[in-house]
Amino acid sequence: MRVMVDQDLCGTSGQCVLTLPGTFRQREPDGVAEVCVATVPHALHAAVRLAASQCPVAAIRVIESDAGDGERASADPAPSPAEAERHAAKDQHNLG
């Protein structure tokens, strides 16, 4: 999985950074979000989907990698926030 931020669309709310500070950061001085990783570790996939679903301006694009299907964008449909939170909590628990 890869993740991208449309920096022209980013509203600088920082929600993605609050959700996953190791994956997203806000650049100085304008606060636009940037991605910190080239490839998202499997353990953080659900949390990245959650961050994308919570972006108030839908500036985060998740690119799923599937060996049989190449890469496909999956900004829609996003999981419900409750479903994504359950998966993110499970992933975070598995990291510890």
Curated annotation (Swiss-Prot):
Cofactor: [3Fe-4S] cluster
Transmembrane segments: none
Chain spans, region Disordered: 67-96
Binding site for [3Fe-4S] cluster: C10, C16, C55
Keywords: 3Fe-4S, Electron transport, Iron, Iron-sulfur, Metal-binding, Transport
InterPro entries hit by this protein: 3Fe4S_ferredoxin, Fe-S_cluster_ET
Basic and acidic residues bias (residue ranges): 83-96
Cofactor: how and how many bound: Binds 1 [3Fe-4S] cluster.
GO function term, MF aspect, one: iron ion binding
Role: Electron transport protein for the cytochrome systems.
Descriptive protein name: Uncharacterized P450-system 3Fe-4S ferredoxin blr2145.1
